[in-house]
Amino acid sequence: MKKQILAVDDSKAIRFLLQTVLGRDYQVVTVPDGYSAMYYLSNRSQPDLIIADPQLPDMENWEFIKHLSTSGLHGEIPVVVLSGLDKRETESRCVEYGAVRYFLKPFNPVELMDSIHDLVSTLVD
């Protein structure tokens, strides 16, 4: 069975790109905002990996990422951040909230795919 990735980004283009690039190897579920992601996480099986933008239209910056780190999901589900914010802020917040990797937008899809493959290969079934 394919590993599942939850992708959270308000950009339809980014969600489409993630689905296209990662969908061949993974089951990719995309949602446009933080509340949809939280609903999904509370009502569905947990994904193996979460890719999320820290700037979501329905939440303050970093609120969803912070929620993951304080909800107990942080240790169970690796989080990769796709950020359009300043590199220094992104680095410090990723460390603070336990994200395993980050990419600044615009990002290289091949580098992202390689990084995701590396991360998923280390996950225990």
Residue ranges and their predicted role:
Residues 12-30, 97:
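Two-component/phosphorelay signaling modules centered on CheY-like receiver
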Residues 63, 86-101, 114:
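Alpha4 helix (beta4-alpha4-beta5 surface) of REC/receiver domains from two-component response regulators
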Residues 57, 87, 106:
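The feature encodes the CheY-like receiver
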Residues 53-54, 83:
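Active-site residues of response regulator receiver
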Residues 2-12, 18-19, 50:
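Conserved acidic segment of CheY-like receiver
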Residues 39, 62-75:
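Short amphipathic alpha-helix used as the core "switch/output" element in two-component signaling
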Residues 107-116:
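C-terminal output helix
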Residues 32-49:
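Acidic, metal-coordinating helix/loop segments flanking the phosphotransfer/catalytic sites
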